[in-house]
Amino acid sequence: MSMQDPISDMLTRIRNGQAANKVAVKMPSSKLKVAIAALLKAEGYIVDFAVEGEAKPELEVTLKYFQAKPVIEQLKRVSRPGLRVYKKKDDLPSVMGGLGVAVVSTSKGLMSDRAARKAGLGGEIICYVA
């Protein structure tokens, strides 16, 4: 069975893994998933990530907890295959008044809403993380 939305699958695996207090979650790897994981690590939402395997690479994301509670409180997919959401640089959302991060796919690659605003770029809003 083919997967219709691999990014939603990734976010759901992370959400479910944290709900079950897992140390790490595994999923099929892609360049976009690795870029999202790198952004989550840079923003401090996950401990680490690694790509394993050659023929069918798997992405392993090590989840982060603080005082036995998941660091990620909210993980919401915004732009999806059925309804793409694009924003100009002036209309980029601020998640939870700046406490969260909007993952934005720009012409210069994947970046946070703050970095996109600083670079003067708009793009597709992939997800919200808080």
From Swiss-Prot:
The protein, known as: Small ribosomal subunit protein uS8
GO biological process: translation
One of the record's GO molecular function terms: rRNA binding
GO cellular component: ribonucleoprotein complex; ribosome
Entry function: One of the primary rRNA binding proteins, it binds directly to 16S rRNA central domain where it helps coordinate assembly of the platform of the 30S subunit.
Pfam families the UniProt entry points to: Ribosomal_S8 (PF00410)
Gene from which this protein is expressed: rpsH
Family listed: Belongs to the universal ribosomal protein uS8 family.
Keyword Signal appears in the UniProt entry: no
Record lineage: Bacteria, Pseudomonadati, Pseudomonadota, Gammaproteobacteria, Vibrionales
Keyword annotations from UniProtKB, A to Z: Ribonucleoprotein, Ribosomal protein, RNA-binding, rRNA-binding
Oligomeric form and interacting partners: Part of the 30S ribosomal subunit. Contacts proteins S5 and S12.
Keyword presence, Magnesium: no
InterPro entries hit by this protein: Ribosomal_uS8 (IPR000630), Ribosomal_uS8_CS (IPR047863), Ribosomal_uS8_sf (IPR035987)
Gene3D superfamilies: 3.30.1370.30, 3.30.1490.10
